[in-house]
Amino acid sequence: MPAGHLGTKRMGELAELAFMYRAASEGIGVARPYGDSHPYDFLVQHGRRLARVQVKSCFTTQRGYRRMGFPIIVAKHARKGVTLYSPDEIDFIAAFVAPHRAWYVIPVEALKGRKSIRLYPGGKSKRIGAFYEDYREAWQLLKEDKKEKDRQQQDDQASTKSRLSERALQR
């Protein structure tokens, strides 16, 4: 049965499965919190880096979306209506455009208060309004930064040397 006949909940679940597979393929650890009361779908880990990720998707294959962009709702539905995600709730939106098998890993700050965005995975050049092309397949954003890792190792080594020096002075 084509994905379009499954309903939005099932298609969202398919996108979440696709995210787990792709993130794990990139060497990123993926954990799903118990229940569905958290604002994020997954916690991801790479080295010491942890991030909260909300998965969104678009499965439509209707004509015109190549030109007009694929719509992705990047807000949450709550009792108060549609509300924005905040950096206190999530770190990234992982948006999946299923017809192109394209992923966009977008920091929540880059959404700049938008409730929906349009993505253009079919085009190679940036179109007017294609603000998120820099985030297409940007899995490196979920990974530990090598400079950050090296800096942390240096800090750990300095801390160890300091503790050893203090012990030597105490003797």
Please place each PLM-identified region on the residue numbering.
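Acidic-basic catalytic patches of nuclease active cores, encompassing PD-(D/E)XK
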Residues: M1-P33
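Conserved catalytic cores of phosphodiester-cleaving nucleases, focusing on short active-site segments
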Residues: A23, F42-V44, R49-S57
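Short, flexible, glycine/charge-rich loop motifs used to bind or transfer phosphoryl groups or to couple energy/partner
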Residues: R32-P33, F42-L43, V82-L84
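Catalytic phosphate/metal-binding cores of nucleic-acid and nucleotide-processing enzymes, i.e., regions
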Residues: P33-S37, L50, F59
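Short, well-ordered alpha-helical microsegments
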Residues: P39-Y40, A102
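Catalytic cores of nucleic-acid endonucleases
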Residues: K56-R101
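Domain-level recognition of nuclease-like catalytic cores that cleave nucleotide substrates
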Residues: F92-K126
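Charged phosphate-binding loop/patch that engages nucleotide di/tri-phosphates or the phosphate backbone
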Residues: K115-S162, E166-R167, R171
